Amino acid sequence: MIELNNHSKINKNENNTNTRNNSSNNNNNNNNINKTNTNKYFEYNQNSIIYSSIPNSFLSHHPNSVGSQCLSLNSFLPPKPPILLSIFNSDTIGNNNNNNYSSSSSRNNSSGCSSSNNNNNNNNNNNNNNNNNNNNNNNNCNIEQYKNNQKQPKQQQQQKDQTIATQHRISLSSSSSSSSLSSSSSSSSVKQSFQIVKRLFGSLSEYMFPQKDEILYETDPYYLYQDDTQSNDSNEFYDDTDIGSDIDEANLNNTYNIQNCNKTLYNKQQQQAHFVNMNKNVNSNNGTGNSNQSNNVNKNQQNNNNNNNNNSHNNNNGNQNSSSSSSNSGASGSGGNGNNNNNNNNNNNNNNNNNNNSNSNSNNNSKSNNNNKKEGKDGATMNGSHPLIPFRKKPAQVPSPCFRMNSPNSDNDQYLDQLALENSSKKSLVVYNTDNLDQWKHSHLNENFDILQNDLIDIQQQQQQQQQQDNTLQYSSPINKRQEQEQQHIPFQFTTEQQQQLQQQQQQQQQNKTKQHPILLQRQQQQKQKQQQQQQIQQEQIGNNNSNNNNNINNNNNINNNYNNVNDLMNKFEIDQKQHDSQQNLVEEKRTPSFHEHNIIFNSFNFICSIVLDGSNIKSTEKYKAKLIIGFCFTILSFIPSWIIFFWLSGINKPAVMAIIAMPMSISSLVILKRTGSIHYPCHILCFTLCFALTINSYYTGGHQSTIRLLMSTVPIISALVLGRKASIQWSLMVLSIYLLFFVANLYGHEYVQGIPSIIIRSHMNFIIDVTIIIMTLIFTLCYQYFIDEAHRETKLKNAQLTIAKDAAIEAYQARQEFLATMSHEIRTPLNGLIGMATLLRDSHNLPPEEKTMAKAVKSCGDILLRLVNDILDLSKLEANQMGLEHIPFRMRELTQQICHVLSGQANEKNIHLSCEVSDKIPSILLGDSGRILQILMNLTGNALKFTQSGYVKIIIDLIEEESELVSLKKGEYNISFRVKDTGIGVPVESHQKIFEAFVQADPSDSRKYGGSGLGLYLCAKLVRLMKGEIGVYNNPDCDGSTFWFILPLEEGTDQSMQQMNNGARHKAFPQDCVKVLIAEDNIINQRVAVKFLEKIGIKAEVAGNGNEVLEILERQHYDLIFMDFQMPILDGLRCSKTIREFEQNHKWNRICPSIFICGLTANTMSTDKKRCFDHGMNHFISKPFQLEQLRSAIEMAIEHKQRNLMNLNIRN
């Protein structure tokens, strides 16, 4: 649908029309049309109707366009097929110049116009009507001939068409000669001007409108007419209030005649065209329709030129109307003007009567005369022929190939599908013309439509053939077999025959591919790729299942393998995780690929990241920021080419050169990032490049008015994300200073270089800047989302690795604890017998002196071995932060004497002088853990004796009166300095720090020469730091050797506390009947040692080999104290203790007696073992190898426990 002029709706109120006419008449004659009107088109773009406007300023290029808009109609139209060109005949353009094409014509010609002007208009109308009469006569003759041709056979049809064409040419020449009103020179000039305008508009139309976007006319198959009866007010559809819905109906009826005439041209090009007889009952309401072929276009153009020339002469004589004629609506006129309009109507009626006489149908003639009379009463000027008038109509919501006609009768039902549409006032029909739809497809949609249809048919046939071949195969489909075997977890294998058959099928499919259309080939390739991916997934699943079965067997065999290193566990975790991901997540990932897969932006970004980051010295913590820099550079490099092209085409060279310079600057930042590994320099270079380039471009595009400067807001964002808060503040101040310079320059009247015209800046630049900002933001957002996804993936992987490592560490710790507990128990058990028997031999009175010395040597060796075991246990406690410290009084001199007594034998063997020096300033009694201090001094003195071949080893203990910076003191504490000085081999200076690490020695060869495990100094350092002290070593300045020192803060003790310890430590014998003791021990040697130790203090004990024997003995007799071993056969000590407590609570022994005191006597010395002891109902705990004093203290505790229980029983009774 096309609207030639943007007519403003004329309301029924006459005041509005008068004011509009007055405003239009005040304009100039030559410019009133061009300034007020715009031409609107309905463009058809595939499935939608789009409005587009063309200013009437293009009309001003034509020299004869003043007052004549109808002349430029054909020049504005793009080349159309014959069915569209036939619309614009001489009747359409000539007769309607006074009816519907005037944009500023008034309803009353008397407003602001003289009577002379109206007379001129009447003359023009008469001339136009005469021309239309000639055309209608010729066209009606052609229609009758066309109807006769339809009844003849198809073989003679081509000859008839040629005769019809010759007749049309004769009619064109006759009508053009009769309708010409001007001289031959004027007509030739008009033709030349028409061709010039047509060429100008051809170039403009190709630039502004695509060739595919066609203008829909009423004959196009995809235009939907809305029913006029939707609204009784015709002003909604027409600009002229006097033209009602009848004009619409007449125009629609005329379209069918036009189609029938135009089909003759399509028959010449296509032999299989269908014909529709739509001539009957077409002119039932508004008279016979006019039909012109495409060959009449030249005649129409001549008639239009003549009419336009006449109209232009009228305008030059003083007519102020914007169009070539007035609307001639006499119903609303008054005075002389109204008389002139009535004359025009009479002339029109006469012309219509002449046209009706030329028609063959008398009934139609009577109907047309009646309709013309009604129109004359209403004041509308219509020709009897009712040509097709382009009018402004509301577009349809859903385009569909349909036409409307009022007559319900139709002869050719095989070509028409009638759909009744009921409206408020009358009924109308929608007729679908399938023939015209096919023609329109060939001419408008796609030239290769038939080729595609044939290709589709070939594809369907090929698919049917393949299905038949598949059905004839004797074996079942390999894919079905694969699915069945996958369900049974059996690997699938093709046979040789099946492989050959599959290869043959693939070759046939490849041959068929070459015959198919490329679009269809792409679809088939995509489907095959999907099938191949699914097959690969299935094969991988089968392979993974087989590998998992093998791995499970290997894992079952290697369950008991222990990992001594965390790296081994991490490697195992990575392998297991890859296998797990391939089993569970591989199918989902391939069926639903990630957003970043098959994405050009992300693939190119990953490629750049791999080039820059691989082999660089960038820290792992700064790789995320390095990726941000790469993302910004990638965004800049992707948009610089478009900016260069834009500025270069606009004629601005300097901004284009700056954009070119920005590319190597961005690339240089990436090179610096790769070589230096620092993120600071590349980020500053990138920010400087952006600021400099955007400042220059802003200067050449308007300065403070330029929208390019808005892009500088990205500079602080880049610096904030990469360099932090300080850098972002600095670059923010830089950007603000640039904005301020532009503003100040504008205040002082500085004229910026306006490289681009202001129109382009206002229209194109803003649009380009907005699109650039949006796309840059989008790319940065996508890159940032990629960073987040990568960070989440890495975090998830690290969390999983940490979880596995944590579990592995816990398992390793538990395994180590179990190992230590087991080894401690297994070592301490024989040590208990060894040290115990050596102690008994040493204390015996009947043993000779030599044998006593031998017993002492065995006892010392056992003590050394016990000390080594204790060191290992202490190490595990220190690493687990489970080491506890005692706070008991001790004498420092006694402690040093004990050390000298123990190590004197080793010193005498090497002829080394061992001495101890204790300062008198040290208090006699101190509070602290004497056992740990003794252990430290023993280790340091033993190392000095071991690495000294001759000379001396001296222990020096002194008080530091001044406050030491190494150790902080509290009130009542003293800094005690301990030094062990020797004349041995010494310690290198570079080894002073690492010598206190675990399993480290100053020289690795020392372990072979002197022995040792490397744990002594490490334990000493741990114990000193645990007691809030410091330890170190230095070489002797006056002699060979070195000095090990440590400082401890110790409190001063009292004499009362020391007396209590001495009283408790006295060796005294207990009465025989004071306590009854039972020893539960499965080792015979330990049984004898325990019995002999108890006999020394006057206690007789009985022995049980396991927990069941203990319960049997307790059923017969009550005992006050039980020394219970943990690990015993049949029933261990823990369960036996718990059973005893249950019996006591339930009174199963049927006697009233105090509860039994149970003392754990075991080689399990771990902290967890002690806790388990108390949880199972034991009262005390002694570790093996035990001493006599430990047994004495346990007996004393048992006596006190017995006394308390007896008192409680007496109170109850």
UniProtKB/Swiss-Prot annotation:
Primary site of residence: nucleus
Span of domain Histidine kinase: 822-1052
Pfam family, one: HATPase_c
Record domain Response regulatory: where: 1076-1199
Modification(s) after translation: Activation probably requires transfer of a phosphate group between a histidine in the kinase core (transmitter) domain and an aspartate of the receiver domain.
GO biological process, alphabetically ordered: adenylate cyclase-activating G protein-coupled cAMP receptor signaling pathway; culmination involved in sorocarp development
Subcellular location(s) of the protein: Nucleus membrane
EC annotation from Swiss-Prot or TrEMBL: 2.7.13.3
Region described as Disordered: spans on this chain: 1-37, 98-189, 279-392, 495-565
Keywords recorded for this protein, A-Z: ATP-binding, Kinase, Membrane, Nucleotide-binding, Nucleus, Phosphoprotein, Receptor, Transducer, Transferase, Transmembrane, Transmembrane helix, Two-component regulatory system
Sites bearing Phosphohistidine, chain numbering: H825
Bias (Low complexity) ranges: 98-162, 171-189, 279-331, 339-371, 498-511, 522-565
Domain of life of the native organism: Eukaryota
Gene Ontology cellular component terms for the protein in this record: nuclear envelope; nuclear membrane
Transmembrane intervals: 600-618, 628-648, 652-672, 676-696, 729-749, 768-788
Role of this protein: Involved in a signal transduction pathway that regulates morphogenesis and controls entry into the culmination stage. May act via the regA pathway, being activated by a morphogenesis-stimulated ligand, reducing phosphodiesterase regA levels and allowing cAMP level to rise to promote the culmination stage. This protein probably undergoes an ATP-dependent autophosphorylation at a conserved histidine residue in the kinase core, and a phosphoryl group is then transferred to a conserved aspartate residue in the receiver domain.
The protein's name in its UniProt record: Hybrid signal transduction histidine kinase K
Organism: Dictyostelium discoideum (Social amoeba)
